[in-house]
From Swiss-Prot:
Its EC number is 2.3.1.47. GO terms for biological process: biotin biosynthetic process. The modification N6-(pyridoxal phosphate)lysine is found at K239. Substrate binds at R19, H131, T353. Pfam families: Aminotran_1_2. This is 8-amino-7-oxononanoate synthase.
Length: 387
């Protein structure tokens, strides 16, 4: 059996698909030390630059002094601390939905929602470019799993119209993690209301970045109706929020159903309460420091100007995710390694994370990048385009 595994690993390496784990030797930042070398990095999801913020470091220390470093039990036994409860209430008020429920990861949050609400006899409708967690959850639920072409609402409408399923659940990324484009949330909600379907919106990459005071994709457009029983909202707390975890926001009966039937909620140790305590401070910074989002917008515009004439197209995106489409995996890896030689870290994204022939450099920006950082990346890529 080990020989089979070794052969499969060799084949993966020959195809340019082998993955390895870089080891960071300091805090998350645009300037990092990896395996003993200093790099300018454009690959983290720390969009607002909060992961190493002094106020969050102090809040984490305060949380540890108050609650210790481990929760010791699941939320349903004795692992639900005051800090968890206060954060859930603060998040509900922030996103404007009645209730929220904390999870250790976005993957676990999506898994809980989909498997608790859908099963045999039900149907799940999914955008073809959704995150793996939504796909895995749909498969595990044993509901009928129906995918529609990326952002193709006409096809989705036909699928919803013809289904005989007992329950219908539409699942989609709000901001697509590998393309940086956004789902038409208002139109999706209208469809779901028309066909009596829930909409699970995964806003992992929009929360903190988009909308009024960073409230996320629900606030990116004035046309989005948030006071509806059809909406289920998920966002993560380890990206723009700079810490760790995730939450689901919805009407009270949905949240109570997740508490009763969400297996990834009830059958796991709760996240340390010190993280929830830290996230209360993070939420204040997200809400109050609008300059971070304003700066991100300026950096996004600057990057797109610097890269517009390259032979590799930059996909359309107004978010911090700026994918440079390369094509073949080997070419993406070549660019990745050539940038590393120049002290710049932008890992290649290859299948199966993206479709075959769609390998790319996923450039992600942070509010704490500088104009000089962006210019340096642009100059390096223009130089490589001549090679």
């Amino acid at each position: 059996m080990l020989a089979d595994l070794s052969e499969a690993l060799r084949e993966r390496q020959q195809e340019g698909l082998y993955r390895s784990r870089p080891v960071l030797e300091g805090p998350q930042s645009p300037h990092v030390t990896i395996d003993g070398r200093d790099f300018l990095a454009f690959c983290s999801n720390d969009y607002l630059g909060l992961a190493n913020h002094p106020a969050l470091i102090e809040a984490a220390a305060e949380g540890a002094r108050c609650y210790g470093v481990g929760s010791g039990a699941s939320h349903l036994i004795s692992g639900h601390f005051r800090a968890h409860h206060e954060l859930e209430e603060a998040l509900a008020a922030f996103v404007g939905l009645p209730r929220t429920l904390l999870f250790s990861t976005g993957y676990m949050a999506n898994m809980a929602v989909v498997t608790a609400l859908a099963g045999r006899g039900d149907a799940i409708f999914a955008d073809r470019l959704n995150h793996a967690s939504l796909n895995d959850a749909a498969l595990l639920s044993r509901a009928r799993f129906i995918r529609y072409p990326h952002l193709d609402l006409d096809t989705l409408a036909r699928q919803l119209e013809t289904t005989k399923a007992r329950r219908r659940l539409v699942v989609t990324d709000a901001v697509f993690s590998m393309d940086g484009d956004m789902a038409p949330v208002a139109e999706l909600l209208t469809l779901c209301q028309r066909f009596d379907a829930w909409l699970l919106l995964d806003d992992a990459h929009g929360f903190g970045v988009l909308g009024e005071r960073g409230k996320g994709s629900l606030y990116h457009s004035q046309r989005i109706e948030r006071d509806t029983p059809y909406l289920i909202y998920m966002a993560t707390l380890g990206k723009a929020a700079g810490v760790s975890g995730a939450f689901v926001a919805a009407q009270a009966p949905v949240v109570e159903t997740l508490i009763q039937h969400g297996r990834t909620y009830g059958y796991t140790t709760a996240a340390p309460p010190l993280l929830a305590h830290t996230l209360l401070t993070s939420l204040q910074l997200i809400s109050q420091e609008s300059w971070r989002r304003e700066r991100l917008a300026l950096l996004i515009e600057r990057l797109r100007q610097r890269l517009h004439s390259l032979p590799w197209p930059l996909l359309l995106s107004e978010t911090p995710i700026q994918p440079l489409l390369v094509g073949e995996s080997q070419e993406a890896v070549r660019l990745d390694l050539a940038l590393r030689e120049r002290g710049i870290w932008v890992p290649a994204i290859r299948p199966p994370t993206v479709p075959q022939g769609m390998a790319r450099l996923r450039i992600s920006l942070s509010a704490v990048h500088t104009e000089a950082d962006v210019d340096r990346l642009g100059a390096a890529l223009r130089d490589l385009a001549q090679c």
